[in-house]
Amino acid sequence: MDFSKLPKIRDEDREAFVGYVQGVSGPVVTACNMAGAAMYELVRVGHSELVGEIIRLEGDLATVQVYEETSGVSVGDPVLRTGKPLSVELGPGIMGAIFDGIQRPLSDISTLTKSIYIPRGVNVSALSRDVKWDFTPSKNLRVGSHITGGDIYGVVNENSLIKHKIMLPPRNRGTVTYIAPPGNYDTSDVVLELEFEGVKEKFTMVQVWPVRQVRPVTEKLPANHPLLTGQRVLDALFPCVQGGTTAIPGAFGCGKTVISQSLSKYSNSDVIIYVGCGERGNEMSEVLRDFPELTMEVDGKVESIMKRTALVANTSNMPVAAREASIYTGITLSEYFRDMGYHVSMMADSTSRWAEALREISGRLAEMPADSGYPAYLGARLASFYERAGRVKCLGNPEREGSVTIVGAVSPPGGDFSDPVTSATLGIVQVFWGLDKKLAQRKHFPSVNWLISYSKYTRALDEYYDKHFTEFVPLRTKAKEILQEEEDLAEIVQLVGKASLAETDKITLEVAKLIKDDFLQQNGYTPYDRFCPFYKTVGMLSNMIAFYDMRRRAVENTAQSDNKITWSIIRENMSEILYRLTSMKFKDPVKDGETKIKADYAQLFEDMQNAFRSLED
């Protein structure tokens, strides 16, 4: 492996900013001679210049958490201060890239070193300086114009899906003294020069932002548009909004990763940031393998999904401390695209691994442990992460709205939801998609348990549904009632058997089975069912509930007459209708199209009505 090509830190005041290693304990290093350093300042530890961050200061002693393997660091090694907090580079080139937890570009490092491992102390800029981007300045901006933080002063077509808007960093303002003409520039070329109070400042297309700091916005707005996931059980029963927070807790093998990957593939978001935090490396390689092949249709053109996705990979065999950084890196990238006016979804898979990293570092610092050994500030850290979600009015001109939705997978040990991470998360998030091991063992996927899951956004979304799908809200209420009734009846059935139930109860059981097997269950690996558009979800639910209502009415109306209609008579006479109801999910939205599917469902509804009429006559 040739390390000579990798750049080292070069700093004029290098000697003035040097402390010395005093002790090493795993990823935690103590350094002396650090007077004047700041909390969360970035430092370089040892002769290999390992990346670290100051997490505690006492006198001239600093405690540093190192984001790389510390073997070989010895007492007396230099600790170089950079004077900057841990920051990320924000600019063209993020989409389609894969970074590690501290935004080092993995593909660039592998090209440089010809190795599958990241060498220690590597210092490669996150965004390539060699690529030229086609920059177009804003039409209404000229020399002498006034410009303030968040204003868009140019556009770069990053790819055919993402128009990358070049914004002025939030804290800058001034009068334009130079703006670059349209043309090809790389990320180190100056494209804008401002003067403010006699001081001139130059700007490139890249801005640097500290990861622990929230990017400012004009105001936070209430969320009112659903995040459509393409999973029927989530869209119909437990919807999330664009700008919402969601937790997916579940034991191993329940399908958390499949749900978060299908969200990344099919949800109605403009940008996806997928953070693999302490999960298996195979899952990230699966994403890298699947996403470039997956396509979506935009304005009649077929595009690769990878063009709207950025990956932050911090697998379980990478240093523990960097897991914490990867979550912050991911959310900062999300906020940057939100500020352009995009709807961003961030998948964090999984926040439990992040909490475990906090626990390990906290243990090394000899802090007082709380529940299960986690630090006392676990809840505060989780809250400060989830609170960065939301729908906002972005800073600067032109006026625009953006949102960040956070979907956090949680892996409680043994599937125990009373685990501190799960209970702290549930106190913060608004949507809970609880995965059930028993459903997963019965091969019922997505294994979302409809009895324990909930969404607090249903009220906020009622207005949207009333406007676009008027019949949907009562349908959802009815479906939940049927599923709840079925759960109550299940105990009676086990005691006395199905035969001794009332006719209406038999119908409830039958329709609940229909809803569970042919509506809530969904095969994510088939072309017809991997993504279910909302019109198809509503159409299917509408016919199933209509079937329930008609059956119930038929049984109740003829209960006193001589020719009683019972559950078994309906089942014998309507086997074809039942078969068509169970086959509704096989309609392919891509091949058949919306008009044909809606017409087929309407036809089925008509045939159902006619069948019940003739049965009653």
UniProtKB/Swiss-Prot annotation:
ATP hydrolysis occurs at the interface between the nucleotide-binding domains of subunits A and B. ATP hydrolysis triggers a conformational change in the subunits D and F, which induces a shift of subunit d. The c-ring is subsequently rotated and results in a continuous proton translocation across the membrane. Coiled coil: none annotated. The keyword Protein biosynthesis does not apply. Ubiquitously expressed (both isoforms). GO terms for biological process: ATP metabolic process; cellular response to increased oxygen levels; intracellular iron ion homeostasis; proton transmembrane transport. Transmembrane segments: none annotated. Keywords: ATP-binding, Cytoplasm, Hydrogen ion transport, Ion transport, Nucleotide-binding, Translocase, Transport. Belongs to the ATPase alpha/beta chains family. V-ATPase is a heteromultimeric enzyme made up of two complexes: the ATP-hydrolytic V1 complex and the proton translocation V0 complex. The V1 complex consists of three catalytic AB heterodimers that form a heterohexamer, three peripheral stalks each consisting of EG heterodimers, one central rotor including subunits D and F, and the regulatory subunits C and H. The proton translocation complex V0 consists of the proton transport subunit a, a ring of proteolipid subunits c9c'', rotary subunit d, subunits e and f, and two accessory subunits. This is V-type proton ATPase catalytic subunit A. It comes from Gallus gallus (Chicken). The lineage of its organism: Eukaryota, Metazoa, Chordata, Craniata, Vertebrata.
